[in-house]
Amino acid sequence: MGIEVISILVGGGNNYMHLFYDDDAAFCVDASNPRILLKALGINFKKSIYDEKEIFSMGEDRKKRRELVYLFTTHKHLDHSAGIRCISEESPNTKTISGFSGDICKSGDKFRFKDVEIECFHTPCHTVDSFCFYVGEKYLATGDTLLFLGCGKFFGGTPGQMIKNIEEIKKRVNHDAVLLYGHDYSEQNIRFTEEFYHVPEEIKKKKFLKLAEEIKYNPFFNLKKVSIEGSEEEVMGKLRERKNKFSKE
């Protein structure tokens, strides 16, 4: 796959925007801050993770600004979708793709960026319009469906839907694919996971995990290991409730 990806922390430091790019073109997942995105199109990157202050301070070559081919949005919450209108106005040739605005996608839809295929997975639960985007069989941009050793709150769905989402992802996604999350909640989620079992130091040092690592260590993938009684759906629901309370502590 002849493209690179950077992740930009915006919105106070825990929202991720993901920009896939080569020398002359790019596509983005979740334009949380469209001004940062537009500036990033003209920057030569030296690492894989930046915060928005770093992007603001970097030099930009407007003559070599990359063409923004697609803007994919994982769900309608404004901390992920706020940039759609601005990008549509500033970059009218950009194709905006989501489950709720612009070009409405459905599960199984595929788009091409150069020689890279991007497949849409409908993953309703956090919201009814939640999608993950599978990029070149190497990355899965998950929005708030899956997070580092966690998953999103069930605002628009049921525990059964999250179980189904996880099983579909396990079945359809390369287990060596890297998950690109919608937020950096890694520290909190590590602490929560260690209420049930130990998380190795090499996992704690990472910001993004492979699917195989999530399968092994994410408690929402391991419902039989969390010492909660009930059916599979009941355990998923109780685990999510316990995580909600943990987040407020």
Curated annotation (Swiss-Prot):
EC number annotated for this UniProt entry: 3.1.2.6
Family matches, as InterPro entries: Clx_II_MBL, Metallo-B-lactamas, RibonucZ/Hydroxyglut_hydro
Residues binding substrate, per UniProt: 183-185, 240-243
Record's keyword annotation contains Hydrolase: yes
Keywords, sorted A to Z: Cytoplasm, Hydrolase, Metal-binding, Nucleus, Zinc
Cofactor: Zn(2+)
Binding site residues for Zn(2+) 2: 79-80, 144, 183
Keyword check for Zinc: yes
Gene Ontology cellular-component terms listed: cytoplasm; nucleus
Enzyme class name: hydrolase
List of residues binding Zn(2+) 1: 75, 77, 126, 144
Cofactor binding notes: Binds 2 Zn(2+) ions per subunit.
Catalytic activities: an S-(2-hydroxyacyl)glutathione + H2O = a 2-hydroxy carboxylate + glutathione + H(+)
Family in the record: Belongs to the metallo-beta-lactamase superfamily. Glyoxalase II family.
Record's protein name: Probable hydroxyacylglutathione hydrolase ECU02_0580
Native source organism of the sequence: Encephalitozoon cuniculi (strain GB-M1) (Microsporidian parasite)
